[in-house]
Amino acid sequence: MPSTARSAPPVGPRLLTQLAELHRRHGDVFTMPGVGLHVAGPALAKTVLANLGADYAEHSDFFATATGFLTPRDLQQRIARQARDLLTAYTAAHAADLPRLVVNLAPEAVMPDAGNRLLHEHLGPVLLAAGTDPSVRAVVADVVTHAVLAGARARRGRLRRALLRHRAYAALAAETARRRQDPARVPTDLLDVVALAMPEGYDPVQAADVFLSLLFATVGSTGFLLSWALYLVGRRPDQADAPPSALVRETLRLWPVAWMFGRPAARAHHLGPARVEAGQTVHVCTYLVHRHPGHWPAPEEFRPDRWLGGVHGAYLPFGWGAHACTGATVATGLVADILSPLLAAYDVTVCDDALQPQVGPALAPPPHRLRLTPRRHGRR
């Protein structure tokens, strides 16, 4: 999944409501005061993200680093492809581990953190293989706790965040350099994928940031997707027996983790009725695309059965075009594979009321307690 939607507008508890109201009043292209132009229509959203007319600067949310975008494009593609293939092989080989991990959530789990930690435990060996320096493992675990979990960054001061960033960069740079010393080494984990793909004279900060993007995508975004799916089923237990793949798709429709994609205009042009100036950022809001009343019947309702007929056109949970997330199938398949044994074995109930999503660069579920009660007769 995309690591984050890095160009999201300022966050706040009422932001989604404000965006929906602006969409209702002004249509599929509208301006949010102080933020800029937003797109809520699927056709225009695809136009912006596909960028076939080169109206926007080449942009990849995943490969944005502290020192600029990792380039060239073929390097991005090589890393993305190798990471996807490694994750695909790992998840297939370790699918039998999932029922054991699911049991650890019972009888009650604090979500969404428990979902992120489940993903970290399951994917730990493909993030950092056996033999990785223990200090690197420790700092990556700290990054999960203090940066990946929903709301974690807001709970730490700027200085402590900076110190953690410095520790992570130093540890990952040293481990990357060590791994590159072996000319015969082949990728056995995601850090290898990044380390061995980087060219001579590479920027160690960029290498570290790309690995951290992989960490955020696998443990963060995919963990949020899992938690959202369980949250929705916990609110609508009558939907628990829907096909897991349909549950995942409908979850991503209602609550796309990557909910906002910003694209800077490379030149002046028109987008629908709006004039876009060079340098202006256009925000594609997939949250609004996925709830567009002109494209979805009962858009606010959780209805997994709407996916039994195939994929809908007004659906962009992983972006669109050349820079769409290459790991989409891995992420959705893994979450479906977790839901299958979990919902076969347990009824799930959300124990808290009147909850609001955590709106930030990623759209995360609200903190809540999820109760898992053993099913007497399995799935109906």
Named regions from a protein language model:
Residues 53, 285-310, 351:
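Conserved cytochrome P450 K-helix/beta-meander segment immediately N-terminal to the heme-binding cysteine loop
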Residues 123, 190-251, 335:
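Central I-helix of cytochrome P450 enzymes
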Residues 330-363:
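Cytochrome P450 heme-binding "Cys pocket" and the immediately downstream C-terminal segment
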Residues 8-23, 241-274:
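Conserved cytochrome P450 K-helix E-x-x-R motif and the immediately C-terminal K′/meander segment
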Residues 1-15, 35, 40-178, 375-380:
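Cytochrome P450 catalytic-domain helical core, especially the substrate-recognition surface
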